[in-house]
């Protein structure tokens, strides 16, 4: 038995049992309640055969990728590429209705990938990790990602790298097994990520620049803009690009929202919990950040940081 599968069976048996529930893809031609109707186009249902229930309906291009196949493929790849699980922490969640799965493997001290200490503050450590997410109801697209979790900040900053082109829709052309091959380059991926954060941390921003980033990311949403301002852990006049990035990831991590207090023209906000499912919110907001980080607006600051770092080295 491969290492990850044994660990999940031993330490996360309830979630593992959910993940390995037998599922099947069945073609549906008719619906009835109470009258029988024929569908114009057949649909395909992901069916929980153990509990005799349909999880979700899909079109003809959908490929069912059972959670068990994902876990077995990941487990085999970890063993194949020598990624041991000694001194790791696992966060494993499968929705009771089998709608989605999320597994995180975090590498602690004295593990295969010990945390990275930032150069400007050795107490500011970033913990490495791997995350896999998927769903049967199409609410979450399959992803396998390298990740960082910041340990010293109040909100637990996290960041992801998609390990190349492994963010895929479940179409008939998708090969889930091929996605795990990227794990052989995991050490290089982590090294590039930590270098990126050192670059972010090298660039001090003015208050106007911080405001510009929050405004562009918020895309006209006053609630989102004010949430970012409240979760920024540093003074806007004394923040780096790293600090601002930390605030963006707080937005994605904590499923919070800013709600206006008082009259219509009030500028006061309070932070409250969002009503959305936390894991679905997490994944959706992560995608927002990924898109913004790739935008010309953020890339401008990244290139500015590279130039600033180059001048310091010279």
What are these regions (language model features)?
Residues 38, 95-97, 124:
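A generic structural signal for short, solvent-exposed coil/turn residues
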Residues 57, 70, 75, 79-90, ...:
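Structured alpha/beta or helical-core interaction and ligand-binding surfaces enriched in interleaved
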